[in-house]
UniProtKB/Swiss-Prot annotation:
Quaternary structure note: Component of the eukaryotic translation initiation factor 3 (eIF-3) complex, which is composed of 13 subunits: eif3a, eif3b, eif3c, eif3d, eif3e, eif3f, eif3g, eif3h, eif3i, eif3j, eif3k, eif3l and eif3m.
Organism of this sequence: Xenopus tropicalis (Western clawed frog)
The protein's role, per its UniProt record: Component of the eukaryotic translation initiation factor 3 (eIF-3) complex, which is involved in protein synthesis of a specialized repertoire of mRNAs and, together with other initiation factors, stimulates binding of mRNA and methionyl-tRNAi to the 40S ribosome. The eIF-3 complex specifically targets and initiates translation of a subset of mRNAs involved in cell proliferation.
Cellular localisation: Cytoplasm
Each WD repeat, start to end: 8-47, 50-89, 144-183, 186-225, 283-324
Listed name of the protein: Eukaryotic translation initiation factor 3 subunit I
UniProt record similarity statement: Belongs to the eIF-3 subunit I family.
SMART domains linked to this entry: WD40
Listed GO biological process terms: formation of cytoplasmic translation initiation complex; translational initiation
Amino acid sequence: MRPILLQGHERSITQIKYNRDGDLLFTVAKDPVVNVWYSVNGERLGTYSGHTGAVWCVDVDWDTRHVLSGSADNSCRLWDCETGKQLALLETNSAVRTCGFDFGGNIIMFSTDKQMGYQCFVSFIDLRDPTQIEDNEPYMKIPCSESKITSAVWGPLGENIIAGHENGELNQYSAKSGEIVNSIKEHSKQINDIQTSRDMTMFVTASKDCTSKLFDSTSLEHQKTFRTERPVNSAAISPIYDHVVLGGGQEAMDVTTTSTRIGKFEARFFHVAFEEEFGRVKGHFGPINSLAFHPDGKSYSSGGEDGYVRIHYFDPQYFDFEFES
């Protein structure tokens, strides 16, 4: 399985995301550019330039018309996917940590960091109402006084958002009323990443407590646990098989103070039903920060602390593989 190596960032990758068709791969890093690549051959299609700080998150809508990015320059920006033109600049008081389009692509949500005396907020803006963008006035802002949001995704049908917090809590916020519909605490440390399954019925979390867990999207019921011996930075669910892929590794500042075993940086494949690991893919020099499955399930990509993105196309053996418990 020879990867395609994408070199378009000078700093470590923060998030990677495929569009729904899977022909484009969007990557952001701790440098100010948002890159878009052809996923089939790794050719760079272009960049979205405008941010002046590290970009923490990126999302693309259902029909690949708009791209959303959130950055440490205290702004969330909306781009025209095809031309790279900036359509909207939404300024905030602190860094934008997570962002996302709802199912229809009409409503965006983004969350800001708790820093410099400012509270963590989740903001919702309806793109059909130009005054909300011009006046930078979200139709709803939910304060998170307890613990800041470190990852968030839209739930099924755009009815709510699922947010993971620094203290390991998972909250479900209603996109209509802003109330907390559901709240659980299955992780003991920060939740680094949340990704939903293709049909939005389940989602998988990745946490600093060295586990990744599978939950029901509607009830937040805990289904499965995938254990590792190092912090998990990202996890993704295969759209065609009962597989999840986990990526992580020790933070750069802790590497010298821990045993060498924890410093390993492979992508690890687990079977969902049996919670068993069945494969590993080496490659990155440093921790893996973000993972994404291609929507057709025939390849996956990983972005690492080394600033590279790798696109891996699975070998034929992967598709013939039968898991025996």
